[in-house]
Design a protein with these regions (language model features):
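PLP-dependent amino-acid enzyme catalytic core
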Residues: 1-143
């Protein structure tokens, strides 16, 4: 659910804050997040998404789901390494100030679809509120 809402939250927030740059989502995945993020951002105006995954670290079905995702703004990169290496690479891109300057000059800026993005976490709060309310209504103890 959160990854279907995130693209629209980002685009709306960018518009309200007069952000003119196109948002480039960088995400590392070990499987399911990649497909969900690609599907959520597919053909969303003002965005591009690049998903990095370990070639030998996802199931064949997960890989096929990612590499066959439709969308003119979706890109998938299989790396030789594990998830931690993919995640480290993404973090390095985020912290590279020279790369950020080059991206800005070209009209782009980075963001993420991983859980470091508060826009991904906030919609998930609904799950916890619902579960609590249901337990309370059923008079079950909350752990």
């Amino acid at each position: 659910m959160a990854l279907s809402i995130l693209p629209h939250l980002l685009v709306t927030s960018a518009r309200k804050n007069n952000v003119k740059n196109e948002i480039v989502i960088l995400t590392a995945t070990s499987g399911d997040t990649g497909k969900a993020a690609l599907a959520g951002f597919a053909d969303v105006p003002g965005t591009k998404i690049i998903v990095f995954y370990p070639k030998s670290g996802v199931s064949p079905i997960q890989e096929k789901q990612m590499v066959t995702q439709k969308g003119d703004n979706t890109f998938v990169v299989g790396i030789h390494g594990n998830f931690d290496q993919a995640q480290t690479g993404v973090k390095k891109m985020f912290s590279d100030t020279e790369l950020a300057k080059e991206m800005d000059a070209a009209g782009y800026q980075f963001s993420s679809a991983n859980s470091i993005n508060i826009g991904r976490l906030v919609p998930q709060i609904a799950y916890y509120v619902y579960a609590y309310a249901k337990l309370y209504a059923d008079r079950k103890s909350v752990v």
